[in-house]
């Protein structure tokens, strides 16, 4: 059995021996993306599992060990991990936990310390916690993020973004209910099989997969009747995690809406952009600057490959590239606003409005200052740019009830339906007017 080793400041390390013996548990956020990430790490030699437990026990365990005024995502992530350790499914003497650390000023950078504190209180002080980060915040002898691993993660991000995007655009209109979701599951299985054989992550294989995904989704029979189109933005965990947002996408689908959720690639490029800015402004190694620049260029090329595949299909709404999002906030919010989701959150709302998704749910953990500034705080400015924007901020925390959240969203949808009906009526009137003008011209031509 692996020996427990600690750093000078008392942090329990994840050692090379543990890599051979331990199972690593990871909290879930994006179901499709994380299945692909799971395979990437398993292929790299880690016995890793993405958690799927989502009962109310997760919240209860979180409340036991995390103060209820702490960031709601922290409470859920920690609750999910402790609930898993309590389940009896895992040998807790051979289990490690993994959590991401962005290294920014958001409270998310402190989740790892809150998790260690909670583990000690719950009697799991001997469970090591691995920080997944590119900032050099914490290192472990038994875990390393290699350039090859990063590139494979990027491929997973692009595939996940594309499947999420196309599923949302097709399932709202599909004639055979469930066909779009079945295609997502089919592609996840195909990609997992390719990943296990080191295929589909780069080059021609990657581009061919993107083309095939777009082709197959476009082949699903649909009836494109006018529907309310709703964008979902917000704090990254609450925006994406069905556990955190009370299955928001499912609720919007039940209200007969088409949903658009901006992908993870935008956030990835946003973080790289910030790192480059910080090195220029505050100093840093030239090697790190070159590596981040290379990585950003690589991500941009992968993003472009996805957008190119989508542009071949006029039936799909193609999201804007990150470079365009960056230009949208000029005169609205400064680039120095980069805590949490920062100016990207504002940019995503502007881009959604520009793309025809003027009805927006802004998901925010209660008390999340960056989210309130860049999300709720920007609604007024966004309305000046897009007067028809219909944005509702929704707070999520342990005491917020699903009924209240859904009632607020229903009020927003009521306004959205009124706007849609007015638009349809105006289009019909314009069409009738044109037809009338054509009819009047016919006798004149005949003479």
Model-identified regions with their sequence ranges:
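An N-terminal assembly and electron-transfer interface module characteristic of large anaerobic redox
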Residues: 1-447
């Amino acid at each position: 059995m692996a020996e427990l080793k600690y750093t000078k400041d008392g942090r329990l390390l994840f050692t090379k021996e543990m890599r051979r013996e331990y199972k690593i548990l990871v909290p879930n956020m994006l179901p499709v993306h994380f299945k692909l990430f799971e395979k990437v790490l398993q292929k790299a030699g880690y016995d890793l599992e993405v958690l799927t437990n989502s009962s109310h026990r997760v919240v209860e365990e979180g409340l036991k060990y995390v103060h209820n005024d702490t960031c709601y995502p922290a409470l859920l992530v920690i609750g999910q991990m402790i609930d898993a350790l309590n389940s009896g499914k895992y040998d807790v003497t051979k289990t490690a936990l993994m959590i991401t650390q962005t290294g920014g000023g958001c409270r998310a950078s402190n989740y790892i310390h809150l998790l260690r504190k909670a583990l000690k209180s719950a009697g799991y002080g001997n469970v090591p916690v691995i920080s997944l980060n590119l900032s050099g915040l914490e290192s472990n002898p038994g875990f390393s993020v290699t350039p090859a691993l990063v590139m494979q993660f990027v491929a997973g991000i692009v595939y996940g973004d594309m499947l999420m995007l196309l599923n949302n655009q097709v399932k709202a209109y599909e004639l055979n209910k469930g066909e779009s979701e079945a295609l997502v599951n089919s592609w996840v299985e195909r990609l997992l099989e390719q990943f296990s054989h080191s295929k589909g992550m780069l080059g021609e294989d990657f581009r061919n997969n993107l083309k095939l995904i777009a082709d197959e989704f476009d082949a699903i029979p649909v009836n494109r009747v006018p529907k309310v189109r709703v964008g979902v933005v917000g704090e990254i965990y609450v925006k994406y995690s069905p556990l955190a947002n009370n299955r928001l996408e499912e609720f919007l689908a039940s209200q007969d809406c088409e949903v658009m959720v901006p992908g993870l690639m935008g956030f990835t490029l946003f973080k790289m952009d910030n790192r480059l800015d910080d090195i220029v402004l505050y100093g840093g190694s030239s090697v790190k600057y070159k590596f981040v620049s290379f990585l950003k260029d690589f991500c941009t090329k992968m993003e472009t490959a996805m957008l190119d595949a989508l542009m071949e299909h006029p039936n799909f709404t193609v999201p804007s590239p990150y470079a365009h999002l960056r230009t949208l906030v000029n005169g609205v919010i400064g680039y120095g606003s980069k805590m949490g989701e920062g100016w990207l959150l504002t940019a995503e709302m502007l881009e959604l409005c520009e793309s025809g998704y003027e009805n927006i749910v802004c998901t925010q953990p209660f008390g999340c200052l960056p989210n309130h500034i860049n999300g709720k705080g920007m609604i007024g400015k966004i309305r000046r740019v897009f007067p028809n924007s219909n944005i509702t901020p929704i707070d999520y925390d342990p005491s917020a009830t699903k009924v209240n959240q859904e009632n607020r969203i229903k009020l927003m949808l009521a306004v959205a339906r009124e706007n849609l009906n007015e638009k349809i009526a105006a289009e019909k009137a314009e069409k009738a007017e044109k037809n009338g003008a054509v009819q009047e011209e016919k006798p004149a031509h005949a003479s």
